[in-house]
C-alpha cells in the first residue's frame, strides 16, 4: 500500500505487485500470497465494451486485480496456473455469454 501511494502522480506506475517471500537470506522462496495494487484503466477497454453490451466479463486468477475490478462482472482468484486452467474449464461448462478472461 505504501508503494502504491508513492507511485502516483504524473509518472504513476499502473501496477504494483507485492509478493511476500519466506525463508532466510540466500534461501528465500516466493509465496502465493501476492497482492496487486493497480490503477484503473485511464480509458475504456474491450472489457468496458463487452460489459456495456450486457455480456459477462469473468476474471479468472489475477484479472480482477489487474483491472482494479473495473468492468469485471464475476471473478474467482486462483492458487496457481493449473487452478486457473481448471476454473476456466469450469466456467466454460456453465451458461455464460461474454468473455472468460484468464
Functional labels for PLM-detected ranges:
Residues 1-102:
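Feature captures the catalytic ectodomains and active-site-proximal regions of enzymes
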